Amino acid sequence: MIDELRQKYTLKILLRISGLSKPTYSYYRCEKHLNAVKRRKEEDERILSLILLVFEHHKSRYGYRRIILALKEELADINHKRIQRIMRENSLFGKQPKNKYHSYKGDNGEKKDNLLLHKEVDEESHRTKYVRDFDTSKPNEKWTTDVSEFRCAQGKLYLSPIMDMYDGSIISYDISVSPDFTQTKRMIDKAFKQYPDLKGLIFHSDQGWQYQMKPYQKWLNDKGIRQSFSRKGNCMDNSLMENFFGIMKNEMYYGHKFKTLAELRKAMEEYIIYYNTERISIKRKGLSPLAFRQQSLSQIQLSY
């Protein structure tokens, strides 16, 4: 009560009216402060225990933003700065990119159309600029693919995945010791088996040799799929897939030593399952790629 009235009255007057001595007042004030500190510390420990459950489950892959998203119900009333402070004080930092990664590139062929690139003219400067359009309104409108190399003590593995631009989910993938055309066919066959009706889909890739093979182009054409290519030497035209490779390598590859190809393959397969089913994103409203996809597909079915 005294502390609340100190804005209007001097401490001397308040102590005289209350009958408290200054040492007694100082003692109670100190005790009140210590109790508040104790309660705050206990609450910090409770918050930390929740954070650790998520942080350890996701193998140190989550920074404070994803931690907040994963614990949005448990920590609904907690300020994000407090969570960030607790994680910083306990050295809980999400993995950050440290190494550059390089997608495997086959030999380029002739130039092809980029269906995701649109020209716009600036009204003031009248200059033409190119704008990439990765936006989609529903699943299976735009897919993208690429190949990336993973090394271990025993040799190399190549990952060839297909990603849906709508939700970031990995539709299909193949892991091989050689980035050959057989790998591309296995990947395509898995995707087509899962989704037989893909008429109108835009399927994007770089200008790798495998994507310019006549059989590959016929597979797409027979399904009514429109093929799209990145411009030569422009990795940003396929930045969604490049970003996926970067995230994957940062979270399960860099900093880990794999002795055998079998060990590396197992880690890659487990990560793709984790990425699809557990790795949440702010862009996907706190859902994993497959959870967001299933939600969207369910809404589409209900609308019919």
Question: Where would I find each of the regions flagged by the language model?
Answer:
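Two-metal-ion RNase H-like nuclease active-site motif
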Residues: E141-F150
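Active-site beta-loop-alpha junctions of metal-dependent nucleic acid enzymes
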Residues: R151, G155, D174-P196
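Residue-centric detector for conserved, function-critical "anchor" positions
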Residues: M1-K8, I13, C30, Y304
